[in-house]
Amino acid sequence: MEAMLMAFVDDVRSQCTASEPLGRLRQLAAAHVRWRLQHPEIAEVFDIAFGMRTRVSSLPAEHRARIRAIKRIYLDELRGVLNAGARSGTFDFADVRVTAFAIVALCGSAHTWYDPAGDLGIDDVAAMYADFAAGMVRAPMRVE
């Protein structure tokens, strides 16, 4: 599980190339959703690590610590983007911790309803979720 989590974090971080907070947040959200839709079976495993604490708490302490450290890398990246946006006046939100967890929950749920045979492609859904994340921090939506 640790290797899968780290592969997810590395993949998402590699797609976040924007220097300004809004672009980076949009890239992070889109990459998160895209990865989960491209790897739905692994996304189910992540639900255990990111959401179901009771199962993670049953792991040996050394594994729990490594999983928490990997989760922290991802959350620190997201919180860093949120804090940078707040400092620059681009974002407006009440609490960085709650906002970060809300974005993680939002992006982490896309695989539960997505149908690859449906009328929306993965990139379409990823772009919409990037808009949702931008809206959560009261930032402008993308313009088409």
Regions found by a protein language model. Give the residues of each.
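Secondary-structure edge/capping motif, primarily at the C-terminal ends of alpha-helices
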Residues: 12-16, 46-54, 114-117
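A conserved beta-strand->loop->alpha-helix hinge within the catalytic CA
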Residues: 20-24, 98
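Alpha-helical structural segments
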Residues: 1-15, 23, 27-34, 38, ...
